[in-house]
Amino acid sequence: LYLNFYKDFIMSTESDTVSDTASLFEQMRKKLKGVIPDFEIELKAKYAQEIIQLKKEKNAIILGHNYMEPALYHSIPDYVGDSLFLSSVASKTEADIIVFCGVWFMGETAKILNPTKTVLVPSREAGCSLAEGISRNDLIELKKKFPGVPVVSYVNTYADTKAESDYCCTSGNAGKVLSH
């Protein structure tokens, strides 16, 4: 259901039809003209073409979060969207490797949802200030201070924090979870 709702956000990079860097450059240029200078698009098209080739060779799927760098966003992902949508895609993929171009907790969530797959996050430093707002240790201390109080964590937290929580919610279902 979630995938059907967000079908308008699914983006094909047309990578199956892009056989060379020049074609990819033109495809990217159409989307990025006036946003990124041509010389930068040309350089990034070369990198993107290499990534697309590796993706095919390794049977990988690339998931791109909405906050990705524009040139890569418009060239390499098989799907783009928010973290919840992309996690849903990750849970259903047949690909051997999931490359999650997003922040660290998104890759962790993909691994939780599809534990037999290899999940890669291109940058270990890709953090989220929201997820950094509370650590597992912080939560353990709060649970000691307030024993018996159910803990509800937001989906945008790290896996170790979620593991210490009683419930995990999204912005869309927080009200229902809290009234439970």
Where do the model's predicted regions map?
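Short, Lys/Arg-enriched N-terminal segments with co-localized hydrophobic residues
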Residues: 1-10
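Active-site loop-to-helix "anion-binding N-cap" substructures in soluble metabolic enzymes
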Residues: 12-180
